[in-house]
Amino acid sequence: MEKLEARPSSFSRVTITELMIPSYANFGGKIHGGILLSLMDKVAYATASKHSGAYCVTVSVDTVDFLQPVGVGELVSLMGSVNYVGNSSMIIGIKVISENVKTATVTHTNTSYFTMVAKGDDDRPTTVPPLMLETKTDIRRFVEAIYRKKFKMEHAAYQKEIKKNRDPEEIKRLLAGERCEVGV
């Protein structure tokens, strides 16, 4: 197997800008979170595919922070960068900003991290190029992603523990003082 040449994050950095139209609004008059999630998935795909040179799929969305609402008529720019690469996976950092075109006010509205996996022609995970860390920001993002991966693995073990079957006495103790009523 040939060795893949490392690519800098600048190679695959992607920005998508879209006007927020009335049909994107929720009942509160702001842009629906699902619209923003769909756009984030699009920029994550474009970024990961550009880095890997392959078709990519979303395998997880680690966090989506909704920091500020987005209004109808604003321009939203979604910026994606490869923060980490594994063998076939990549963690894509996404920053979303909105611009009020009337006031020229720019607001950071969302931050998110998508884990993408590159697929080969056989639809199986395929190796991606290493990431060339060229700046202190690149190094910081890569290290943060290592910690994010570690936390994610610990969280998965924690979730498994939560889902364990509990004995009835433990359940009674857990529910004591909670705002619930048991009807069975």
Predicted regions and their residues:
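HotDog/MaoC-like acyl-thioester-processing domains
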Residues: K3-L4, S9-V14, V72, N83-V184
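Active-site-flanking beta-strand signature of metal-NTP-handling nucleotidyl enzymes
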Residues: T15-L19
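Hydrophobic residues in beta-strands and at strand termini
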Residues: M20-I21, F66, M116
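Surface-exposed, Lys/Arg-rich phosphate-binding patches that contact polyanionic backbones
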Residues: Y24
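Anion-recognition interface
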Residues: G29
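Active-site helix/loop of acyl-thioester processing domains in fatty-acid/polyketide metabolism
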Residues: I35-G53
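Conserved interaction-surface patches within small, structured recognition/assembly domains
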Residues: V57-P69, L75-N83, S98
